[in-house]
Swiss-Prot record:
GO terms for cellular component: cytoplasm. Monomer. Its EC number is 2.4.99.17. Residues 344-364 are annotated as: Disordered. This is S-adenosylmethionine:tRNA ribosyltransferase-isomerase. The gene is queA. PANTHER family: S-ADENOSYLMETHIONINE:TRNA RIBOSYLTRANSFERASE-ISOMERASE (PTHR30307:SF0). It comes from Thioalkalivibrio sulfidiphilus (strain HL-EbGR7).
């Protein structure tokens, strides 16, 4: 397929710049994976769309305050650092923005408190060593800014420390939030438990590469960025138990999808820990995931391609056109979708006005 196939027109005012007052107050566009039917709901309705015995799989990564501002110590030239990956207690791989790229040995003075030395480069990333006795994770927690996406056109604020983080975040390492999880609050979690829905957690540390545009028109030539993920033995056992009782595996976010599908790359779900470059486009055969909770994604993005692979290209693009027409809020702080098979959608009222089942382009 072509990159331009995944373009859609989005009025800028639909890009959410701040979170709603309540996490679960977001809207929820439901797309029936079997029929293409659409329904406009609220996110707090999600427990009613799940069945007892279903397994919800979250990404438990925690966003680190990975953005640092400062200067080159010797010249005073401004720099902006975005940590991509923490290597050990003192070293990181980072994107460094400056008028002139800093060379090996250059000292950066960041947030008027931190000293970092450029040790070298790995491709587009810089290897930085942070001085001091404290681990770099703690330094970032004290001095860093939350790495809001580039389409949020405001400085980070105190509320972002809480709201650009899921309520179940526990393993620091991401530089972007797994945004489908941002809608869940304590009430939603309690209602799902009461309904008999089980939960599991994988980890995928979302990298800044998630915001990088696809630069080739033939999407099959795109090289996916690497992100670290882990799927435990416990999660594999939970998925097997879910299958045995006839439940559905519901991934919360595209990162949970990529974690699970990476761990099942040879056809069987197995424990996995390491980097994944899994790039899912229409034509991909899903091995683990039956339903998906996801936000609305950027035009021409790899995430939109993944969702199109899961639910069919035409139904997804129709759903996006509907979302624009109905003034849904888009991207990280925006609204969500629930994409499930027909048995998850018995309460849906079709809004698309189509009586004919659409063709799903799984063989593109």
């Amino acid at each position: 397929m072509r990159l331009s196939d995944f373009h859609y027109e989005l009025p800028p005012e639909l890009i959410a710049q701040r979170p709603l007052a309540e996490r679960s107050a977001s809207r929820l566009l439901c797309l029936d994976r079997d029929t293409g039917a659409l329904a406009d709901r609220r996110f707090r309705d999600l427990p009613d769309l799940l069945n007892p015995g279903d397994l919800l799989v979250f990404n438990d990564t925690r966003v680190i305050p990975a953005r640092l501002l400062g200067v080159k110590r010797d010249t005073g030239g401004r720099v902006e650092v975005l940590v991509e990956r923490v290597l050990d207690e003192h070293r990181v791989l980072a994107h460094v923005r400056a008028s002139k790229s800093p060379g090996e040995g250059v000292v950066l003075w960041l947030e008027e408190a931190l000293e970092a030395v450029v040790e070298g480069r790995e491709g587009d990333l810089f290897c930085l060593w942070f001085a001091g006795d404290l681990p770099v994770i703690e330094l970032l927690e004290r001095h860093g800014h939350m790495p809001l996406p580039p389409y949020i056109e405001r400085p980070d604020a105190a509320e972002d420390r809480d709201r650009y983080q899921t309520v179940f975040a526990s393993r620091p390492g991401a530089v972007a939030a797994p945004t489908a999880g941002l809608h869940f609050d304590a009430d939603i979690m309690a209602r799902m438990r009461a309904r008999g829905v089980e939960t599991a957690a994988v980890t995928l540390h979302v990298g800044a590469g998630t915001f990088q545009p696809v630069r080739v028109e033939d999407v099959s030539r795109h090289v996916m960025h690497a992100e670290w993920t882990e799927v435990s033995t416990q999660v594999c056992d939970q998925v097997a138990a879910c299958r045995a009782r006839g439940g559905r595996v519901v991934a919360v976010g595209t990162t949970a999808v990529r974690s699970l599908e990476s761990a099942a790359a040879d056809g069987e779900l197995k424990p996995f820990s390491g980097d994944t470059r899994l790039f899912i486009t229409p034509g991909y055969t899903f091995r683990v995931v039956d339903a998906l909770v996801t936000n609305f994604h950027l035009p021409e993005s790899t995430l939109l391609m993944l969702v199109s692979a899961f639910a069919g290209y035409e139904p997804v693009m129709q759903a996006y056109r509907h979302a624009v027409a109905e003034r849904y809020r888009f991207f990280s702080y925006g609204d969500a979708m629930f994409i499930g098979p027909q048995e998850a959608s018995d309460k849906m009222q079709e809004t698309s006005g189509r009586g004919e089942r659409p063709r799903f382009d799984h063989e593109i």
